[in-house]
């Protein structure tokens, strides 16, 4: 069993993009920014416990940080982990429904 304190640190924020919106509509998949050291099992447990939905599968990938310039200085954004969480049939989770 994963401690509740760890579950709260696993999920960082929803990742809102055009691709994420299409994934939600077509395949009932939500896209989340998660902790870089989070495992698929931890992500699944955190989503099920915090949002009270049933998760079918979790796919993860590491996103490389972009190189950005600020004047003549060159910097780099941090690498981060993205998770595609597919919800079971009939389950629904809406992050941006109240933003209209």
From Swiss-Prot:
It holds the Pfam family Ribosomal_L23. Gene3D superfamilies: 3.30.70.330. GO terms for cellular component: ribonucleoprotein complex; ribosome. One of its GO terms (molecular function) is structural constituent of ribosome. InterPro entries: Nucleotide-bd_a/b_plait_sf (IPR012677), Ribosomal_uL23-like (IPR013025), Ribosomal_uL23/eL15/eS24_sf (IPR012678), Ribosomal_uL23_CS (IPR001014). One of its GO terms (biological process) is translation. Keywords: Ribonucleoprotein, Ribosomal protein, RNA-binding, rRNA-binding. One of the early assembly proteins it binds 23S rRNA. One of the proteins that surrounds the polypeptide exit tunnel on the outside of the ribosome. Forms the main docking site for trigger factor binding to the ribosome. Part of the 50S ribosomal subunit. Contacts protein L29, and trigger factor when it is bound to the ribosome. Belongs to the universal ribosomal protein uL23 family. This is Large ribosomal subunit protein uL23. It comes from Proteus mirabilis (strain HI4320).
């Amino acid at each position: 069993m994963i401690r509740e304190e760890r579950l709260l640190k696993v999920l960082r924020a929803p990742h809102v993009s055009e691709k994420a919106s299409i994934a939600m509509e077509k395949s009932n998949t939500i896209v989340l920014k998660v902790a870089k050291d989070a495992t698929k099992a931890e992500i699944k447990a955190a989503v099920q416990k915090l949002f009270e939905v049933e998760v079918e599968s979790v796919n993860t990938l590491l996103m490389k940080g972009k190189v950005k310039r600020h004047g003549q200085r060159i910097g780099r954004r941090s690498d981060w982990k993205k998770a595609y969480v597919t919800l079971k049939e009939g389950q629904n989770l809406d992050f941006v429904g109240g933003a209209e």
